[in-house]
A protein has these predicted regions:
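Actuator/coupling domain of P-type ATPases
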Residues: 1-43, 331-338
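Hydrophobic alpha-helical transmembrane segments of multipass membrane transporters and ion channels
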Residues: 3, 12-23, 44, 48, ...
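Small-residue-enriched core segments of transmembrane alpha-helices in multipass membrane transport
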Residues: 13, 39-57, 381-402
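Conserved catalytic phosphorylation-site environment of P-type ATPases
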Residues: 54-122, 274, 292, 414
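Re-entrant/interfacial helical elements at transmembrane boundaries that shape
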Residues: 58-67, 105, 133-137, 294, ...
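Membrane-embedded alpha-helical bundles of multi-pass transporters
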Residues: 68, 174, 231-233, 253, ...
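ATP-binding catalytic core of ATPases
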Residues: 109-153, 174-189
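Conserved ATP-binding TGD loop and adjacent catalytic N/P-domain core of P-type ATPases
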Residues: 160-162, 203-341
Length: 416
């Protein structure tokens, strides 16, 4: 974490400075008042300036923040991302499985029942959410003997009985030179708003039919979108779905901007453009989102998503609750406000107490004469006795560390 590294670097210089200062203080008071006074002031400097408060300022706040996040079902895999999150200005979302519910359902298809059952059996071999929805849509329990191949961002290919089957998007069929008839295109167009997720099924060079799937927006997506608007945070949807469907969802949620019909590579290029505008947060769930999750400044992965997506995300939403993103943002702001307070206290404490331990008040008092400052209860007399013994210096050091700990404990509270 950048701020932790900076504090560690300062602490290293601070220790060297204090050792040098203690030596100078010892030499000064040895010449001025003798060894007894020299040992007193040098020991006080070493004890009161122990960099515990400085060293505790960042790590204890982070530990408590991570603990708070865990209680709210947010797994922080990369603590450095917690520092960046508070600076985020753009929140970018995948749609399917992220803003919409993971569970898909078959809305309509124009396949024969035997072809539909065959497609569902083939999809049973893929871990993709669309494949899971299809595999559970058929009551037939077919046993297949063939060669399965997953084609990322496009679909699957299955070779069986001297035939090649394709199941996936339009780009997959175009890649293998399979044309789609006007009847199939019209079928897709008639369902593109209600069921924007389309799976084409082809055998050799013939498109057998189309399956249209649908899923609803997550209940909490509206709450997150409202939070982003209230905090003047820009929101974007990057989706591979058709434009009409994405536009409808963006309108429902009040998302500021959207891009549709994107491949995984298109998403990466779009994300890189957005990163030129500021710190970007990307939220995704699928295998196709893994590259974008890795590239983003800060990333959230859904726990129900693919293992690859979860390994790439900086945060994992354990309960798949999008409202946890808003909580993490508030936690990031609170954590670094407290870290700044801790660091201010640590530096303020050292700036005030080290001169006292070094005997500066006594030294100043030695230049003040009674006629100039007045009576026996003069400022000079007060300053002359204003010094710290080693045991008082040690107590002051303990108090400074305790103050940092108590301030950090405020991170245990629920942020609402």
């Amino acid at each position: 974490m950048p701020i932790a590294k900076l504090v560690d670097k300062i602490s290293a210089y601070f220790v060297g400075f204090i050792l040098l200062l203690a030596g100078v203080v010892f030499a000064f008071w040895a010449v001025k008042s003798g060894l007894n006074s020299a040992f007193l002031h040098a020991s006080a400097v070493l004890l009161i300036s122990c960099p515990c408060a400085l060293g505790l300022a960042t790590p204890i706040a982070l530990v408590l923040a991570i603990n708070n996040a865990t209680k709210h079902f947010i797994l922080i895999k990369n603590p450095a991302s917690l520092e960046l999150l508070r600076k985020a200005k753009l929140f970018i979302f995948d749609k399917t499985g992220t803003l919409s519910k993971e569970t898909l359902s078959v809305f309509a298809h124009n396949l024969t029942q035997s072809d539909f059952d065959l497609l569902c059996a083939m999809e049973n071999l893929s871990p993709h959410p669309i494949a899971k929805a299809l595999s559970s849509a058929s009551a037939a329990n077919l046993s297949l003997q063939g060669e399965f191949e997953s084609l990322p961002a496009r679909g699957i290919r299955y070779k069986m009985a001297n035939h090649t089957y394709l199941a996936g998007n339009a780009a997959l069929l175009a890649e293998f030179g399979v044309s789609v008839s006007k009847a199939h295109k019209d079928f897709v167009k008639s369902h593109e708003v209600q069921a924007p997720i389309v799976v084409y099924f082809a055998k050799d060079k013939e498109c057998l039919g189309v399956v249209c799937l649908t899923n609803e927006l997550r209940d909490e997506a509206q709450d997150l979108a409202e939070f982003l608007r209230k905090n003047s945070l820009h929101s974007v949807i990057l989706s591979g779905d058709n434009e009409k469907s994405v536009a409808l969802n963006a309108q429902k949620l009040g998302i500021d901007e959207f891009k549709a019909n994107l491949s995984p590579q298109d998403k990466i290029e779009a994300l890189q453009e957005y990163q030129k505008k500021g710190v970007c947060v990307f939220v995704g769930d699928g295998i196709n989102d893994a590259a974008a999750l890795s590239l983003a400044n800060v990333s959230f992965a859904m726990n129900s998503g693919s293992a690859l997506a979860k390994s790439a995300g900086d945060f994992v939403l354990i309960k798949d609750d999008l409202r946890a993103i808003a909580y993490a943002f508030k936690l990031s702001q609170k954590t670094f406000a407290i870290i700044k307070q801790n660091l201010f206290w640590a530096f303020f404490y050292n700036a005030c107490c080290i001169p006292v331990a070094a005997g500066v008040p006594s030294f100043v008092a030695s230049f003040a004469t009674a006629p100039k400052i007045a009576t026996e209860t003069s400022l000079a007399q007060i300053l002359a006795h204003f010094t710290l013994t080693p045991h008082l210096a040690a107590l002051a050091m303990c108090f400074s560390s305790l103050a940092v700990v108590l301030n950090s404990l405020r991170l245990k509270k629920d942020l609402g």
